[in-house]
């Protein structure tokens, strides 16, 4: 089991979207993944993100690789995580990269 796999819910730890939750939609390579909020739910636009700037959470939803924002939103509603995704959290900075 990988930590950063499709459907994993994460918190962005850096940038203007720091503290917002997102869902991994696709794995680009060893260092980058494609994430989305979707924007209508948590405010995170679909974009490439470095895995060093993500903090994985224990939640995972069942979506296919490359799922659209509508499919991600439907999966979040099915799992009952819409309100959870709207909450902003204070990201913790890992000491391994400082």
From Swiss-Prot:
A cellular-component GO term for this protein: cytosolic large ribosomal subunit
Biological processes per GO annotation: ribosomal large subunit biogenesis; translation
Q: Which UniProt keywords apply?
A: Ribonucleoprotein, Ribosomal protein
Q: Which InterPro entries match?
A: KOW, Rib_uL2_dom2, Ribosomal_eL14, Ribosomal_eL14_arc, Ribosomal_eL14_KOW, Translation_prot_SH3-like_sf
Source species, domain of life:
Archaea
GO terms, molecular function:
RNA binding; structural constituent of ribosome
Keyword check for Phosphoprotein = no
**NCBIfam families (alphabetical):** PRK04333.1
Similarity-based family: Belongs to the eukaryotic ribosomal protein eL14 family.
**What's this protein's name?**
Large ribosomal subunit protein eL14
Higher taxonomy: Archaea, Thermoproteota, Thermoprotei, Thermofilales, Thermofilaceae
């Amino acid at each position: 089991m990988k930590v950063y796999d499709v459907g994993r819910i994460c918190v962005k730890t850096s940038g203007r979207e720091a503290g917002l939750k997102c869902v991994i939609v696709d794995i680009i390579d060893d260092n980058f993944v494609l994430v989305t909020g979707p924007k209508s739910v948590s405010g995170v636009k679909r974009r490439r993100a470095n895995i060093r700037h993500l903090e994985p959470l224990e939640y995972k939803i069942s979506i296919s690789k490359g799922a659209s924002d509508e499919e991600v939103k439907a999966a979040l509603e099915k799992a009952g995580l819409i309100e959870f995704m709207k909450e902003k959290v204070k990201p913790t900075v890992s000491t391994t990269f400082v």
